[in-house]
């Protein structure tokens, strides 16, 4: 087990993509290891939840690293609507061209096919009122990096950067099946805004004000 002093938080670089995609895979099963579910396309989730942030929001992207490599990341998007618009025009067309929409009964799709369907039919969430929580955040840590305080530090650093740029608030989504993450966000000061769906498809959206209003 690595000592806490072995961990480094640093700005993300384009060269971090492969390592960050791996973190996304290893946390891609409701916070647990998703590798068994995506053996046919290990980068499927990373193309949605990592790549666009490294490309479009590098100043709001942080990497957690230890001697064994990249073990976590935290990403932010200053204006979610602008981010999604850029994703729609600059990122998603390439995904759709490379990965055809799956056919057949959706109930029989693999996890990978479900993600490939997301490429073609994305679901963009923005909170109401949008002006209160226009930014959004995303974080994942490998198991070896959890419980050391680095997740909190990374989130606080990204929120500080958002605050300095004038964001009044941020939101994020967490699976209803990921109770540890929900508790983590509560301890960071996020409060529940709305629940969408249920079970494996259910998501809890949470928000936090970044100013003193």
What do these predicted ranges mean?
Residues 63, 69-78:
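Conserved beta-strand in the GNAT
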